[in-house]
Amino acid sequence: MKAGATSMWASCCGLLNEVMGTGAVRGQQAGFPGSTGPFRFTPSSDFPTYPPAATEGPNIVCKACGLSFSVFRKKHVCCDCKKDFCSLCSVSQENLRRCSTCHLLQETAFQRPQLMRLKVKDLRQYLLLRNVPTDTCREKEDLVDLVLCHRGLGSGDGLDSRSLSSSRSQTSSFFTQSYFSNYTPPSATVSSFQGELMDREGTFRSEVLTQVQSELASANTDDEDGEEDDDDDDDDDDEDDDEQEENLEEQNPGLSKKKARASLSDLSSLEEVEGMSVRQLKEILARNFVNYSGCCEKWELVEKVNRLYKENEENQKSYGERMQLQDEEDDSLCRICMDAVIDCVLLECGHMVTCTKCGKRMSECPICRQYVVRAVHVFKS
C-alpha cells in the first residue's frame, strides 16, 4: 500500500516538474510573453524580460530643404550663420562650408549695387538665418540696409572676439613654450586655425576689391586711348588751337570753370564755324544728335555743322511765320467757342468778340458787362 502511494506521488511530482519546466521555457521565449502559459512568472527588477526601448533624440533637419540628415545626406555647419545644412544645400570653398544663401551674399562683397541685384527672397532668408526680424521692411532698400547693418552677425562678431582670444592664447603659448618646451597647449592650435580663417576671409574680400578697381581702371584707360586715337586723326592746326586753349586756361584758371561746352546757339554766322576746333565741332554735333562716326577730316565736320546751322536758321524762320499766322487766326476767332470766326456785333455796346451763334446766347457783353439788346450778324467785304 505504501509503495503504491509513493509511486503515485512520484509520478505526480514528475508531471508537475515537466509542466513547470515547459512553462518556464515558454515564458523565456520571445514569442511567448511571461503572462501566457499555464503559470505566470513575475520578472525580477534585476533581470528585465525585454530590453528598454531606445530613446530617440531630437530630429535635426536641414535649414534649407527641411530633410533629415542621413548617411547619403551628411550634416554640415555653415561657418557664417552657424546653422545646420546638408551637403546639397551648402557650398565648399577653401576648406570652408557655407550655405547657399551666405555664399551668394559673400560673392557680392556686401556692396550696395550688388546687393540690390539680388532677390528679395535671398535677402530675407539671410536675415532670418541670423534671427533678424524683417516685418518692418516695406522696400528692398530696407532689407539691404538691414543686411549691411547685420552682416557677419553670426560669424563676424564671434570671429572678432575669437581673434582677440587667439592673439592672447598665442602670446601665452609663446611664453609657456619658452619655459616648457615639451608642453604645447591646444588653445594655440585652435587660435592659429581661427587666425587662418580670418586671413583667408580678408584676402578674399581684398581680392574682390582689387579686381573691381582694376576693371574700372582698365575701362578708364580704354576711354582715354579712344580719345587719343580720335585726337591723332586731327590736323596740326587743331593741335595748335588746343594748345592755345590750354595756355589760356593755365593763365586764367577761372576761365575753364566758366567755359561751357560749345553749342549751336553760340554761332552767329557761318564764318565762325571755320575757326572752331575739332572737339568743339564734335560737341555741337553730339548735342544735336548728329552722327559723325564716319568723318576722318575736319572739313567733313565743318560741312555737317554748316548744314546743321542752315537747317536751324530755316526752322526758326518757319516757326516765327507759323506763330504769326497762328496769332492772326487767334485774333479772328470767337472768344467764347474759339472755333468760328467773329461775325457778330453786340448792341448796345458795339463790341465784336463772338460769332453769331454765341452772340445770340449772350445775356451781357463779356468785355464791358453791358446788357445785350440784340446780336447783329456782320458780313466782311
Swiss-Prot record:
The keyword Hydrolase does not apply. Its EC number is 2.3.2.27. Residues 216-261 are annotated as: Disordered. It is an enzyme of class 2 (transferase). Ubiquitous. Detected in brain, cerebellum, midbrain, hippocampus, striatum, heart, lung, kidney, muscle, spleen and testis. It is a peripheral membrane protein. Residues 221-249 have a biased composition (Acidic residues). Its main location: membrane. It is found in: Cell membrane; Endomembrane system; Nucleus; Nucleus speckle. Proteolytically cleaved by caspases upon induction of apoptosis by TNF. Pathway: Protein modification; protein ubiquitination. The record marks D241, D242 as: Cleavage. CDD domains: FYVE_CARP1, RING-HC_CARP1. A zinc finger (RING-type) spans 334-369. One of its GO terms (biological process) is ubiquitin-dependent protein catabolic process. A zinc finger (FYVE-type) spans 56-107. PROSITE patterns: ZF_RING_2. Keywords: Apoptosis, Cell membrane, Cytoplasm, Membrane, Metal-binding, Nucleus, Phosphoprotein, Repeat, Transferase, Ubl conjugation, Ubl conjugation pathway, Zinc, Zinc-finger. E3 ubiquitin-protein ligase that regulates several biological processes through the ubiquitin-mediated proteasomal degradation of various target proteins. Ubiquitinates the caspases CASP8 and CASP10, promoting their proteasomal degradation, to negatively regulate cell death downstream of death domain receptors in the extrinsic pathway of apoptosis. May mediate 'Lys-48'-linked polyubiquitination of RIPK1 and its subsequent proteasomal degradation thereby indirectly regulating the tumor necrosis factor-mediated signaling pathway. The RING-type zinc finger is required for the ubiquitination of target proteins. The FYVE-type zinc finger domain is required for localization and may confer affinity for cellular compartments enriched in phosphatidylinositol 5-phosphate and phosphatidylinositol 3-phosphate phospholipids. Interacts with CASP8 and CASP10. Interacts with p53/TP53; involved in p53/TP53 ubiquitination. Interacts (via RING-type zinc finger) with MDM2; the interaction stabilizes MDM2. Interacts (via RING-type zinc finger) with PPARGC1A. Interacts with NOD1. PANTHER family: CASPASE REGULATOR, RING FINGER DOMAIN-CONTAINING (PTHR14879), E3 UBIQUITIN-PROTEIN LIGASE RNF34 (PTHR14879:SF3). This is E3 ubiquitin-protein ligase RNF34. It comes from Rattus norvegicus (Rat).
